[in-house]
Structure formats: structure tokens, C-alpha cells
Amino acid sequence: MASAVFRLLQQGPRRLLAPAVPTLAPPVRGVKKGFRAAFRFQKELERWRLLRCPPPPVRRSEKPNWDYHAEVQAFGSRLQETFSLDLLKTAFINSCYIKSEEAKRQSLGIEKEAALLNLKDNQELFEQGLSFSHRCLTQFLEDEFPDLPAEGTESLVSFLTGEAVVCHVARNLAVEQLTLSAEFPVPLPVLRQTFFAVIGALLQSSGPERAALFIRDFLITQMTGKELFEMWTVVNPMGLLVEELKKRNISAPESRLTRQSGSTTALPLYFVGLYCDRKLIAEGPGETVLVAEEEAARVALRKLYGFTENRRPWDYSKPKESPKRAEQTSVAS
């Protein structure tokens, strides 16, 4: 004890009056891992919040790095089609956009005459494109399915030119991002009108042949994997089958129960076959005998119309141009 006091006295009074140096604690190894876990948890919370309450969609033109003129030019190159730039820009302008922009100008105090925009909407191009698409699709379907009646052809054309199919194609071709509309997301009728206006612009720019190939490549392909009666609603398939057989001088079909399983259970299954002149022409399943009979009639109609599941695939190779066909198409357009 005395020796320790002696050493302190030797170091001088400064050592005695010096403040004590705090001892640093060793670093805790789990601090960084805790920060990482908290950061991951915060990111997961943010992801779930976006999934439950997604932000409203924003126009592409409201985001950075957007050049409308360059995007319109790139649209034709992306589809490998030649468009007149003025016609293509007109195809993307809808009347609702012009009205909304004029209303915004008037709300800012601009006079009505000065607020008018020197723009032309796509109504004329839409009518041309829709009319040409109807004629072209009808011709394609009549050539591919010659036994299909006119009612069936019209139903298929209506399906291919309906809002669901056309808007699906238009969105995948980025037509929605270039469409000038008062609302966003673009309403389905406006998007459908814009797509057919683009076809009308292509018809005037490159001619009927390129427009027909465009329709074949982007609308006819939507029939892939579709069953005939998904696109054509037939209320009474048995009555239609009787009419078709009568046109072909074939006797009326007779239905016979060919197989059944689980008739006393909750999930029964029946197979009904249709016979003409003692020959089985079709067979269909169903949970009741009536449903199975209707399905057998649909199977027979598919065979008559050449719309079976094992039919020859659609030929998408470049068609050989027929002078007579080309002349008819050009005259029709």
C-alpha cells in the first residue's frame, strides 16, 4: 500500500488531479444485424401497403424521359410497319381529349375562340379502320371455315372486334401509353376506337395488303385456344344441328345414352351419343342427360363446321397475292 502511494507521489500532482479516462465497452456484434432486420421489416411493410392500397396509375407522359414525337415515330418501327407520321398522330387524338383541353383553357380565362385547338380527332380514321377490319376478318374466316354459316362468322367477327379482345391487343402494343384521352387509365371504348384508328392510318399509309396482314397477325391470333361456342353463343344447339343436317339431306339425329357413372352420387356423369342412319356422329359428356345431349350436339356442329380441336393450324405465312383478290380488296377499301 505504501509503495503504491509512493509511486503516485512520484508521478506528480497532475496525475492525482487528472480526470479518470472512461473505459470503452467492447462493440456489440449484433447491432448491424439488428439494423438489417429492421430495414427488411420496413421494406416488407411498404410492399404490403402498396399491395393493399396501390397508388393511382400515372400517365407515361408525366414521368421523366418522355418524348412524345420520338415515341410515335418508334411505334411504327417497333411493329415493323410504315405509317404516315401525321396520320399516326391523328389516330391517337380522341375528341374527349380535345374537349377537355379546351375546357381547361377556358377555365384559365382564355376566350372561347382563342381556346380552340387546331387538332383533328380520329373519328374518320376509326370508321375506316373498323369497316376495313370487318370486311377483312369476314373474308379470312370465310376462306378458312367455308362451312361456317353467316351467323357464326358474324359472331366470330364481333368477338374479335369487341372491347375485350381489342383492348387486350392495344395494351400489349403500348397503344394506351400514346393515346391522348381525357381520362387515365384510358376507358375501353376510347382505347378500342384508337386501335381501329391506327388500323385506318395504316390502311391509308401502306395500303390494304399491309393492313390485312396487321389484322391477321394481331386479331386472328386471339382465336388461338378458343373453342367455337366460347365466341359464338348458341342457345339451342340441337335445333341448329337439325337444321344443318336437313340442309345436307341427312336424317334427324337420335340421342342414346351410351355410358354413365355415379348416377346415384353427388357427381354423376352421363355420355350421350347422337346417331344418324345408325352411325355415331358425335358423343358428349354432362352432369345430366340433357346437358350431355347439348354437348354432343355442339361436338357434331364443330365437326360439320370444321372447327374441331385437331383441325389444321392457321397458316400465318405470307399469302400468295392473287390478282383478283387484291383487286377486290382495293376496290372494297
From Swiss-Prot:
* GO molecular-function terms, A-Z: double-stranded RNA binding; ribonuclease III activity
What enzyme class is recorded for this protein? hydrolase
The coiled-coil segments of this chain are none
Q: Which domain of life is it from?
A: Eukaryota
Q: Which InterPro entries match?
A: dsRBD_dom (IPR014720), Ribosomal_mL44_DSRM_metazoa (IPR044444), RM44_endonuclase (IPR055189), RNase_III_sf (IPR036389)
Q: Where's the transit peptide in this chain?
A: 1-30
Q: Which Pfam families match?
A: DSRM_MRPL44, RM44_endonuclase
Q: Which UniProt keywords apply?
A: Endonuclease, Hydrolase, Mitochondrion, Nuclease, Ribonucleoprotein, Ribosomal protein, RNA-binding, Transit peptide
* Region span, Disordered: 311-333
Where is this protein found? Mitochondrion
Keyword Lipid metabolism in the entry? The reply is no
Location of the RNase III domain? 86-228
The subunit field of the Swiss-Prot or TrEMBL record says: Component of the mitochondrial ribosome large subunit (39S) which comprises a 16S rRNA and about 50 distinct proteins.
**Taxonomic source organism:** Mus musculus
Signal peptide range in chain numbering: none
Q: State the name under which the record lists this protein.
A: Large ribosomal subunit protein mL44
Q: Does the keyword Transit peptide apply?
A: yes
Q: State the family it belongs to.
A: Belongs to the ribonuclease III family. Mitochondrion-specific ribosomal protein mL44 subfamily.
Q: Name one GO cellular component term.
A: mitochondrial large ribosomal subunit
Compositionally skewed regions (Basic and acidic residues) per UniProt? 311-327
Enzyme Commission number(s) from the entry: 3.1.26.-
Xref: PROSITE patterns: DS_RBD (PS50137)
This chain is encoded by the gene named Mrpl44
Which stretches make up the DRBM domain?
236-306
